[in-house]
Amino acid sequence: MRIGIITQPLRWNYGGILQNFALQTTLKRLGHQVITLDEPIVPNRSILRWCFSMAMTTLRALKNRRWPCYFPFLIVKKYHATIYRHTERFVEQNINVMRNTNHRRLRNADFDALVVGSDQVWRKIYCEDIGISFLEFAKNWTNIKRIAYAASFGTDTWCNMRPWQVKRCARLAAKFDAMSVRESSGIALCKQHFNRHAMHVLDPTMLLDADDYLAVSSQLHLNIGANSLFCYVLDTNPNTTAAINDITARLGLTPFYCMPKYTDIITCKEARQNLDQSTFPPVEQWLQSFATASMVFTDSFHGTVFSIIFNKPFWVIGNKMRGMARFNALLSIYGLQDRIISPEELSSVDLNTPIDWAPVNAIREQWKQKSLKFLTDNLK
């Protein structure tokens, strides 16, 4: 089948890039032709929607007594070629992608199926146009399969949608041939708001094995010592810094990182003045960080996922701002909920507590077969 994938934009997010790489790889191995329909940095908007967006931006800025930033996407676009050059190269070399997709101009005749997912495609705050994630552009298409694979709401509660938006999404969801979600909490959300049954499946990255990721990253060698702690932290704060210092001191580990010094190119002047320190390292380096590390400390969902894939002992500090439902759903599958720690309980945790990987890997294989069956049953 000729399949188009709708997911979050493929820019710098390592987990977002690799979940799409994994889903494409899996679908290709199942015999399909696959392309990811990537969104542009500057969104395709009608004049009316653009004016509405500008008005809302102004109102929010006045309410918060801030100078409004009208064109954040244009700021990112200006520096895009530099700060995303490594991640963009990985995408171009490893993912079949249509860049700057204007979804309204896609043709029905070019596709046999559309797959939405994975990642937080149904989390409104991360979607420029939530209708795209429910295939509104294809609502009148015929002879097309509409599938959601491991779609995520990001949280376990319904939020950030007005009643009319919910009705709009429900009408579009009714057209889907099959739905699956990445978190168990998504099953209830689909039933409550869309009146649709959804299956709980694995994040696409877990459909591949460590060897698959080593195959695309082994050409990059990291000179990391034997006793190392890979610190993949998205939201650095005093708590995460204190936790890293505590873990390294107690276990005698050397911390290392795979993130730029500056990550906010829009509002941070220093980031724009120091582009080398704002550039995201290669995806291959990120993968090799897991392969090389003795232990992983993270507040990232996919940081947790890849720790499991590479069978590395790990500790997760809860990231409530980004959504704890994802972590709880993932770790409950494997009985690893005790790997989530809070700053308050860190001092009382035995950081040398091992993980028995044999049952974890057996569970992952069972879920992998279940998830693959969802794809094979619904894409034929």
Predicted features by range, described:
Residues M1, D110, K139-N143, L214-S228:
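Nucleotide-sugar donor-binding and catalytic loop/hinge architecture
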Residues I5-Y14, L18-R171:
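Aromatic- and Gly/Pro-rich donor/ligand-binding loops
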Residues I147-G154, I187-C190, T240-F280, S342-S348:
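Catalytic donor nucleotide-activated moiety binding site of glycosyltransferases and closely related
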Residues T157-M161, M206-L220:
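Acidic anion/phosphate-binding donor-loop and adjacent secondary structure
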Residues F176-E183, F297:
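A short beta-strand/loop micro-motif in the catalytic core of glycosyltransferases
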Residues A198, L202-M206, A210, T263, ...:
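Donor nucleotide-activated moiety binding/catalytic core segment of transferases
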Residues D276, S332-K380:
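Leloir-type glycosyltransferase catalytic cores
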Residues S289-A329:
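A donor-sugar binding/catalytic signature common to diverse glycosyltransferases
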